[in-house]
A protein has these predicted regions:
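Transmembrane beta-strands of outer-membrane beta-barrel proteins
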Residues: 70-80, 116-120, 156-160, 197-201, ...
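N-terminal periplasmic/intermembrane-space "pro-region" immediately following the signal or transit peptide
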Residues: 17-95, 304-312, 320, 453
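Structural signature of outer-membrane beta-barrel domains
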Residues: 78-82, 115, 122-126, 160-164, ...
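Signature for the C-terminal beta-barrel architecture of outer-membrane proteins
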Residues: 149-155, 168-322, 380, 392-408, ...
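Short loop/turn motifs that connect adjacent beta-strands in outer-membrane beta-barrel proteins
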Residues: 22-25, 54-71, 107-114, 150-153, ...
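Predominantly the C-terminal beta-signal and adjacent terminal strand-loop region
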Residues: 415-448, 452
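Surface-exposed loop and membrane-interface regions of Gram-negative outer-membrane beta-barrel proteins
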Residues: 81-100, 109-152, 166-172, 209, ...
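Extracellular/periplasmic loop regions
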Residues: 26-51, 246-247, 284-396
Length: 453
């Protein structure tokens, strides 16, 4: 109860805010990003612009001719309070805990050379039955890389977070307490309006103690991600020596080819993405796919200036066990809260329909209301969580309906650097969950305070 009271006093949220809702400074500060390394503060070389806001002297510290230092920090406290988690089947179905994390960073520029360092201090209080390394990693190096700018080519090597497109396959895992980082190298090539990122990475495996994170020896990611205005096209290769499918553990090599169209026309906006996967796992052929659509319209002349959006996702599952083929889609390293603040199910073997409305109440307050419905794509396959772990096997059930969910969020941008938010979610079980195990309604209250500059 004490943890809940403390968290309530800290209120907060990770609700993404549209650009129009962000409070922009007089000197047109860049939008703060999750990764932080893609923010450009070089315009503050002008001392008059630095003087417009108290953060100016921190964002641009001149060190000499053509050299400067940018600094910043994120301080987040988040409480999550579950009742009947995993429909009552979790080890601790009624769990209430608080996450604390600090993410300071320093970004040094010397001519065409750059060094970026971001440590993390992350602790958890009250996680049952025990905090995992995603809840608590204590003190660690989250990001640390060197970079050289060769004009149209930028080369980078070291540890870094990755955010590709909408993070359908490669994301930062920002919602949980410990984000995901990768060790490796990356080259960004710019040709006119086109940009191509070529990368070879291994994910960082967090440990429960300080400075014990390690580069994964089992998983690897490589590929190329190209962007044009309103169009992304990419290839991603993936290897996992300890993959698990159908109770079998072995070596998985999977290739993903994706195409994404996105843009805005007047009051309308869209985001449509398709991915096909092929490869092999222990002598079995991989053939999987997904299609995700998002179409929305903003209505700025109505009260609250609402934006109505409909999202539909279809993600393949295995069609028949033992047939020599694996149709189960692998989302690789997806974003942390995939379908919403409460996301017990992940983007594998699923059909998801998600209408939502968001708007503004004035005074820096934003809200959103969402409904979700989930079905199994294939009745021969089960239900998975976001990392891709099987959480409910098919158990012979032919029911497709997994369940329905409702969610409400509210966020207040109290100052340009401080946001408070809250969310409440409820997930009612459908026929498949009712036929295969515990089937209680999950509820989750999330409270968050996030200060960053």
């Amino acid at each position: 109860m004490l943890r809940f009271v403390i968290a309530a006093g800290l209120l907060a949220g990770t609700i993404p805010m549209p650009a129009s809702a962000q409070q922009r400074e007089a000197w047109q500060a860049p939008m703060l990003s999750i990764t932080r390394y893609d923010e450009d503060w070089s315009d503050l070389a002008d001392a008059d612009k630095r003087a417009h806001h108290w953060t100016g002297p921190f964002k641009y510290i001149p060190l000499g001719d053509d050299s400067w230092l940018t600094t910043g920090v994120e301080l987040r406290a988040r409480s999550e309070n579950y009742h009947d988690n995993l429909w009552g089947g979790a080890d601790a179905p009624d769990d209430s805990y608080v996450w604390f994390r600090a993410l300071p960073y320093a970004d040094l520029h010397v001519g065409k050379v750059r060094a970026f360092v971001q440590p993390i201090v992350a602790y958890a209080v009250g996680v049952s039955p025990a905090a995992s390394p995603i809840d608590q990693t204590r003190a660690e190096l989250l990001q640390g890389f060197g970079e050289i700018d060769l004009g149209s080519v930028t080369l980078r090597a070291g540890r870094q977070m990755l955010s590709l497109g909408t993070e359908r396959l490669v994301g930062t895992r920002y919602g949980p307490n410990v984000p995901l980082a990768f060790d490796g190298a990356r080259a960004d090539v710019t040709i006119g309006h086109a940009k191509i990122s070529v990368l070879h990475m291994r994910p960082v495996q967090p440990g429960p103690g300080s400075f014990d994170d390690a580069t994964s020896q089992d998983k690897a990611l490589w590929g190329a991600y190209g962007t044009l205005p309103e169009l992304d096209i990419y290839y991603l290769g993936y290897r996992n020596r300890l993959a698990r499918f159908g109770g079998q553990v072995g070596r998985e090599v999977r290739h993903s080819i994706g195409l994404r169209s996105h843009g805005v026309r007047g009051d309308w906006h869209w985001n449509v993405e398709g991915v096909t996967q092929f490869g092999h796992f222990e002598g079995q052929r991989i053939a999987a796919w997904t299609v995700g659509t998002e179409i929305g319209r903003s209505l700025p002349t109505l009260p609250t200036a609402p934006d109505a959006t409909l999202r539909v996702n279809v993600v393949s599952g295995d069609s028949r066990a033992g047939d020599g083929k694996i149709n189960t889609f692998n989302a690789l390293f997806p974003k942390g809260k995939y379908f919403g603040e409460l996301s017990p199910v992940g983007p594998t073997n699923i059909i998801n329909v998600n209408p939502r409305v968001s708007g503004t109440l004035g005074g820096g307050v934003l809200f959103s209301l969402a409904a979700m419905a989930y079905w199994r794509h294939s009745v021969a396959d089960g239900v998975y969580d976001i990392p891709g772990n099987l959480i409910r096997p098919p158990n012979g059930s032919t029911a497709q309906f997994i369940g329905k969910e409702a969610e409400a969020t509210i966020a207040w941008q109290a100052t340009p650097a401080w946001e408070l938010s809250a969310s409440f979610s409820a997930f009612g079980p459908g026929a498949f969950i009712q036929e295969t195990g515990p089937a209680k309604t999950i509820t989750m209250l999330g409270l968050e305070s996030n200060f960053r500059f």
